[in-house]
């Protein structure tokens, strides 16, 4: 069965169902952010009562504290959080590229940055991002991408799209947690053609 079922459309809008190992998610959906494996001031029972269908966890922060290996030893992110519903983890790319003061270098192999926790130089690659999320055991893992800020020159925006595609290709067939989906991320900023090209490529690397 496909991971996504289209339920209905109206003009350019559509509604569907995302099928994951821990349940279905009606879309469009509001996704509460549990950056460090918890939604601030809301416990799992309250999340369920509020009707949350899926929760987001942040790979960047979980990698540094407490670490994906410890989360795996404790049974994975669902057990660690006390949440038995679907979980999506981002790749850490947004944090790396949006915290511009900590960014040191980005190339086709990966990105080097300073940790916001202790200032040490760290290196993220597509392979590491995939491994972190495999150990976390989320239902949906996101590919590492280059998040270009608004207003960058066209050449930099195009480079971000090309590098995001290159990284998605490398991640497509890497190991995943049982039942884990892996989605690519579309880049291109406000450039319609770049966005369309990125979207077409991303469909090929979503598994």
Where are these regions (language model features)?
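Glycine-rich phosphate/ribose-binding loops and adjacent secondary-structure elements
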Residues: 3, 162-165, 171-200
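Positively charged, low-complexity/disordered segments
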Residues: 201-207
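Non-catalytic, usually N-terminal nucleic-acid engagement modules in DNA/RNA processing proteins
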Residues: 1-176
């Amino acid at each position: 069965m496909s991971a996504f079922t289209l339920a209905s459309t109206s003009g350019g809008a559509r509604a569907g169902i995302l099928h994951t190992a821990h349940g279905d998610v009606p879309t469009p959906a509001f996704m509460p952010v549990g950056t460090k494996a918890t939604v601030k001031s809301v416990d799992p029972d309250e999340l369920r009562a509020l009707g949350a269908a899926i929760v987001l966890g942040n790979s960047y922060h979980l990698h540094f504290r407490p670490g994906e290996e410890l989360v795996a030893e404790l049974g994975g992110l669902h057990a660690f959080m006390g949440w038995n519903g679907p979980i999506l983890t981002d790749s850490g790319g947004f944090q790396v590229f949006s915290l511009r003061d900590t960014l040191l270098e980005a190339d086709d192999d990966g990105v080097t940055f300073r940790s916001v926790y202790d200032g040490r130089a760290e290196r993220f690659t597509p392979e590491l991002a995939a491994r972190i999320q495999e150990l976390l055991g989320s239902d949906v893992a996101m590919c590492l991408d280059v998040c270009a800020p608004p207003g960058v020159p066209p050449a930099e925006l195009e480079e971000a799209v090309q590098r995001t595609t290159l990284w998605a290709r490398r991640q497509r067939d890497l190991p995943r947690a049982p039942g884990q989906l892996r989605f690519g991320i579309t880049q291109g900023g406000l450039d319609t053609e770049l966005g369309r090209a990125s979207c077409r490529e991303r469909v090929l690397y979503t598994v």
